[in-house]
Amino acid sequence: MWLQVILGRQRAVLRSSLSFRFLFGSTLISGLGTWLAVIALSVDVFDRTHSGVWVSALLIADFLPAVAIGFLLGPLVDRLSRKRLLVGADVVRLAAFILLALAVKPWQIVALAFVAGVATGFARPVVYAGLPNLVDTETLPRANSLLRTAEQLTVTTGTLLGGIVVAAAGPDVAYWLNAASFLLSATLLVQIPGGMLQEGRVASHGHWRDLAEGFDVVRRSRALLTVLLTWNLVQIGIALVNVSEVVLAKVSFKSGDFGFGLMWAASGVGAAIGALLAASLLARRSMTLVYAAAIGVMAFGDLAAALSPDVWVAVWCIALGNVGTATAIVCNSLLVQRGAPDHVRGRAFTLIMGSNFAVLGIGMGIAGVLVNAVGARWVWGISAGFTALGAIVGYALLRRTPQAVLEPAVT
C-alpha cells in the first residue's frame, strides 16, 4: 500500500511539468547507455592492453574532468545557457562514442573517454542546478527523488545489459547503443523551453571573480558547507568500500565472481529503494534528522558487512547501507538547491562535486595500499568510521542552519 502511494506521488511529479518529463526521460535514456558503455570501456581497454595501468588511466579520465570543472570552470554553468550546455554535452558524447566504435589504439579510447568525461562534468551539475526552475517548491524533493531513482536504476540495469552486450557482440555494439542514447536524450532536451532551466542571464564580472564568488557562497552558506564537509568525509568511506569490495567478496567471503556480482546487485537495489523513499521521509521528518540518520545507516551497513560471516548476510547489510546512501544524496541535492540562489547554483554544484571527486580519487589511491596491509574487513570497518564521522558533522552543522533554508515554506 505504501509503495503504491509513493509511486502515485512520483507519477504526479511527472504529470506536473512537461519540461521535467523531458529532463527525466533524458536522464533515464542517457544513463542507461552510459552505464552500458562503462562495462564496454573497461573490457575494451583491458583486452587490448592486459594492463591495470591502462584501466586506471581510463578511470582517471572519467572523473578528472569533473574535478577540473569544479575548481576552474564552474561559472560557465551559470553564465551560459544551461539548455545549450545540456544539449551540447549530449552532442559531444554522441560524437565521442561514435569515434570510440572506430578507435583502434588504447590511447584513443582513453582520450575519447576523457572528452566524454568533460561533457558529463558539465551536464550533471547543470541538471541539478536547473531542476528547481522546472518544478515548484513543494514538488522539488519528489523531483530530486525521482531523478536519483532513475539514475540508480540505470546503474543496475545498464551494467547488467553492458555485460550481456559485450559478451555477445563486443564493445563496439555497446558504443553505438550509447551514442544512440545520447541522440535520443538530446532530442528530448531541445524541447525544454530555453529559459526554463535558469531564472535569467547572469552578468560576468570576469572569470576569476565569478569563480571566487562560487567559492564564497559555499563558504558562507551553512547548508552548502555542510554538504561539502560531510560528503567529503563520506567519500573517503565510499572510496575504501569501492576498492576493497571485490577483495571482501573473493577473499574474505570466498564467494568468487558470483558473490561480487551479488554484492553489486544488492548495492543497486538498496540505492533505488533509498532514492524512492527519500522524499517521503523528508515529508515526515526534518532534513537534519533524515540526513544524519541516512549517513548513519551507511556507516552501520559498512560495519555490519565487515562483520558478516558470509556473503549471504553481507548483501542485506550492503543493501541497507545503500538505502542510506541514496537518501543522503537526495538530501545533498536539496540542500544545495535551497541554499544557493539560482545565479550561483551551478558554481555551488560544480565546486562541491569537483571536491567530492577529488577526495574520492585520493581515497581510492589510499584504499589500494590499505587493503593489502590490513585486509578488506578492516578497510570496511575504517570506512564505517569515516562515514559515522560524516553523520556527526552533518548533524552538528545542520542543527545551526536556519529552518527556512532547510525546509522553506510552501507558497
Which residue ranges define each predicted feature?
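Alpha-helical transmembrane-bundle signature of multi-pass membrane transport and export proteins
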Residues: 1-411
